[in-house]
Amino acid sequence: MVKSTMSAILVLALHLFVLHLQYSEVQSLANTSAHDFSYLEFVYDANDTELEGTYDYIIVGGGTAGCPLAATLSANYSVLVLERGTLPTEYPNLLTSDGFIYNLQQEDDGQTPVERFVSGDGIDNVRGRVLGGTSMINAGVYVRANTSFFNQTGIEWDMDLVNKTYDWVEDTIVFKPDFQFWQNLTGTAFLEVGILPDNGFSLDHLEGTRLTGSTFDNNGTRHASDELLNKGDPNNLRVAVHAAVEKIIFSSDSSGVTAIGVIYTDSNGTTHQAFVRGDGEVILSAGPIGSPQLLLLSGVGLESYLTSLNISVVASHPYVGQYIYDNPRNFINILPPNPIEASTVTVLGITSDFYQCSISSLPFSTAPFGFFPNPTYPLPNTTFAHIVNKVPGPLSHGTVLLQSTSDVRVAPNVTFNYYSNTTDLAHCVSGMKKIGEFLSSDALKPYKVEDLPGIEGFDILGIPLPENQTDDAAFETFCREAVASYWHYHGGCLVGEVLDDDFRVTGINALRVVDGSTFPSTPASHPQGFYLMLGRYMGTKILQERLASEEALHKSTFEPKILESLESALSFAFES
């Protein structure tokens, strides 16, 4: 018995050593550093902004996509970013990997960077309320979008620009993670149970097992989208925090309905107005909850719904707030017999049916909101491992509906209808069975409290897997009863329904949406890499559009003058 145990440990150590070598490829990414707050020179509290101002672009939401979008547009134009949340400097725990759990534990006082809500499904959830958005409160996982995702969007992407844009993001806020024991153990187990091939270190969404990028550096410092503001022109950028945008201002004439500005309030309740000049635009980057909410409050939505709420209809858009999705998260928690070090997610197991990862954590006495399905879930009194399954897509979808027609600070009612689509449920069953194999692997044997076969022998925190690994009905019940949010909700302002392929709101001039509300599926196992890229990408595309338009205008007005001058000169020459 002792000999076989020692052999297993030696084999495990060899696996870990080989895995570590495979993950040691060199990649040019960001260098470990302190979080760079240089951008604070052009950040203001909304209380200190003018009551009325005019800009080339107004961006509603300084989050994952909004910050790189603003930085890019500021190269040529004046940009105002209106962020409803606070500065990350107010909450230092945001800036550390240890703070991920702490920030979920912090009570929501209406100002804290993690805003709590409970979906119509009864599932605890959170959203970012801070400059940097969810990139400032998430688990730091960085992945490029699945190649097939681009093909499914209905958009003709400039893939050369996409890749250059990823590089622009990655050389500032993305890092190659150092060795973490639990993450390497997780990778070993994934390979053992057939999540192949071993892809080493890669930022690409690839089927198999790999080490991926992180927005936490190897000192545990968080880097987020706010730092991309440093790449902008400080003379053209103005960011206002604690700025709650209440409505979009529209004008209407023979050319149609046009967004010309926004109304926002500061923390004292004072009303401000900001307008766009000339060919400028209002761009919503308020996320899958905030962007549909603001459109509805501004009179853009299903006509009968808006009328029933006594909201004046500006434009009939039946799909605003429809088709919002959230990837279900199911999991198993194990309590090892001996303490394990805490780790952040850096190793991923990817298949076509499910995405998997694991974290190890210290014990806690206060429940992190949304981490477990509900407040009654048992809490760990020792270190534990959280082994997670994510359903890709998904196909199940729900709605965003207003709870207040006058106050944007009142969160809308969001329902996701988890597992209402049978394909999603089948993917959960498949994934949780694979987690059963994961628990049965040789790599996990040292973490049992009893030497029992298969999935037995673990000290399980919370709901255990069904004992019969072939009982699909029992697994379906498990999936439904133990579901939590992966915090990767998306949709509500879909391209092809609400937006055209340039992210413009159809039927309205000078209004776009650039954020996580725009697509019906998650772009990769973890979406933040795509939306960081999207902000920069769309900023570049808009600059290109403006340049082409201005060159055409210049040509059309300049050439006739040249011809007129030439004609006069020729006439004078012939006459003389």
UniProtKB/Swiss-Prot annotation:
One of its GO terms (molecular function) is mandelonitrile lyase activity. Disulfide bonds join 428-479. It catalyses: (R)-mandelonitrile = benzaldehyde + hydrogen cyanide. One of its GO terms (cellular component) is vacuole. It comes from the Eukaryota. Residues 1-28 form the signal peptide. Glycans are attached at residues 31, 47, 76, 146, 151, 163, 184, 219, 268, 310, 381, 413, 421, 468. Involved in cyanogenesis, the release of HCN from injured tissues. Catalyzes the stereospecific addition of HCN to a variety of aldehydes in vitro. It is a major seed constituent, and could have the additional role of a storage form for reduced nitrogen. Belongs to the GMC oxidoreductase family. This is (R)-mandelonitrile lyase 2. It comes from Prunus serotina (Black cherry).
